[in-house]
A protein has these predicted regions:
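A short, Lys/Arg-rich alpha-helix, primarily the initiator
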Residues: 1-29
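Recognition helix of helix-turn-helix/homeodomain-like DNA-binding domains
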Residues: 27-53
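DNA major-groove recognition helix of helix-turn-helix/homeodomain DNA-binding modules
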Residues: 48-73
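Helix-start/N-cap signature of alpha-helical segments
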Residues: 50, 147-151, 176
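Helix-turn-helix/homeodomain-like alpha-helical modules used for DNA recognition
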Residues: 74-157
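Glycine-rich, aromatic-bearing surface loops/beta-hairpins
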Residues: 152-190
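Charge-dense, extended regions
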Residues: 184-214
Length: 214
């Protein structure tokens, strides 16, 4: 996933549409001959990881490529795979805004429910935050110390983001929708009922936690 997202993101950045065009642009910039060898094709397809050497070469196009490759689009890789302490930066605005994790989780879910009600599109950033909150709540409860939050709504939040057409299109444009959907669907396995809870039921569940719900 990392390779496909990085390569497709770079292709978009320089305005090319496929691995062949990318190689031609890269070769013109660097004086190398990667087009004839098909050097980048398998990474575009997500079949082969990018090596450190390849990332160093790609940094000639985008100096931020190492960071983007590690963090992912809208910090999605960090949300999915970083240690728990790495999740704070994804949620820094929300952690500063809300007094407790319970309120933060409720406010985030409320925002998603409002977007759903008004047919507003979601983004990969919404998905990354949903994943980060899900991990934070459930891993704290399971591994460190119970935080007194059931986290039921986080299953639906992830599913809602994955099912959003704008999120799906954005992930597909990077060549990673199928892989991201498959991995996160595995996270939801066994909790499909929670992931598909009707919106009205979640509004009712949040009513006692959010004073703006009439």
């Amino acid at each position: 996933m990392r390779a496909a997202a990085s390569m497709n993101s770079l292709a978009r950045k320089i305005g090319v549409a496929n691995p062949h065009q990318f190689a031609l642009h890269f070769d013109a910039l660097t004086g190398m001959n990667t087009q004839s060898s098909g050097k980048w094709r398998s990474s575009f397809n997500g079949e082969k990881a990018l090596s450190t050497q390849q990332l160093q070469l790609l940094s000639r196009i985008d100096p931020e490529v190492f960071k983007r490759h590690e963090m992912g689009p809208a910090n999605l890789w960090q949300a999915m795979w970083a240690p728990l302490q790495g999740l704070r930066s994804i949620l820094s605005t929300e952690l500063a805004l809300w007094p407790t994790l319970e309120v933060l989780v409720a406010e985030f879910e409320g925002d998603l429910l409002l977007a759903e009600a008004y047919h507003e599109p979601l983004t990969i950033a919404h998905l990354a935050k949903a994943v980060a909150l899900h991990r934070l709540v459930h891993e704290l409860n399971a591994r460190i110390i119970p935080v007194g939050i059931d986290g039921e709504g986080t299953y639906r939040a992830i599913r809602r983001c994955l099912d959003d057409t704008s999120v799906a299109a954005a992930l597909a444009s990077l060549g990673i929708f199928d892989d991201v959907d498959a991995e996160l669907s595995d996270w939801l396995a066994g909790h499909e009922e929670l992931a598909s809870t009707p919106a009205a039921a979640r509004w009712n569940a949040l009513a006692s936690r959010l004073d703006w719900i009439a």
